[in-house]
């Protein structure tokens, strides 16, 4: 696709019918770590304005742990996983009570959805999330989504909801993603460093990720840094969704398409949510190693992975699981949904379709990974 201008991207955001807004913990809390009602109410006012103008808004909100740790007697955000989960269990209710009261002042209802990584990995849960969100939006509610911090572990997380927000944007077929943080824009280096310059527009976020120096950790009340926000913008851009990154106080202007923060252009036409799920949400359970010919065909982007071109199977997986497709040097080429169990595949390796049909039966005369279920990485 042709790269749009900054004006075109801002206009697309202003005209968006469905917007996903992500807000981090540090944008909702006081320095002490407690929820800041003024910040939360200001965000709600900005969202309510869009909603009352006929737009549809999904809010992905962090803040459960930040809302709960003070109530449970902690001076700061705990680092122990069990303590964090306890704080989230208490804080999520406090957070939603604040949101419910704030939106009610505008005559708007909210619906809470708590999600873990597994809810976007398993196809059935993924479809359930999509159906629930679509229905809430159709009924005029504002869905409020958070990672289920009381169940999630540090080993498998979205990253302060940043990646989650980009996946949700694709699930609801959003027209724009707004990432709210505690800095007003993306900079060429940490804003406190001399010579750091604000970046108002990123035509290709993948190029920017390689060039822009970003901090790797978040604030003392959040878990995400600028890296996860850039990754979220990349997921959105790859799936054809424009994005803007700015501070929470700029939420209203950002959704109106005003020149605040940093705008990110989409770098692909909108893809299917299924392919985005394969590429970004699914967690590979094993690896298929392709020979040089099969690797070349996979890189071409239009070929299925056939048993004749696979030389090794790694891992334990079932049909329908996500797997890596690697070359013989160990480089990841693609992710895909495999059509056979790992125990079935060894007997298939090196055989062409006719041989598979003859020696193993008709049910084996199919690609290991069909091209429709294969996403290059």
Curated annotation (Swiss-Prot):
Family that this chain belongs to: Belongs to the glutamate 5-kinase family.
Biological or metabolic pathway of the protein: Amino-acid biosynthesis; L-proline biosynthesis; L-glutamate 5-semialdehyde from L-glutamate: step 1/2
GO molecular function per UniProt: ATP binding; glutamate 5-kinase activity; RNA binding
Keyword Hydrolase: no
Amino acids binding substrate: 62, 149, 161
Residues noted as binding ATP in the record, renumbered to the chain: 22, 181-182, 223-229
InterPro entries, A to Z: AceGlu_kinase-like_sf, Asp/Glu/Uridylate_kinase, G5K_ProB, Glu/AcGlu_kinase, Glu_5kinase, Glu_5kinase/COase_Synthase, Glutamate_5-kinase_CS, PUA
GO cellular component entries: cytosol
Taxonomic lineage of the native organism: Bacteria, Bacillati, Actinomycetota, Actinomycetes, Bifidobacteriales
Protein name as catalogued: Glutamate 5-kinase
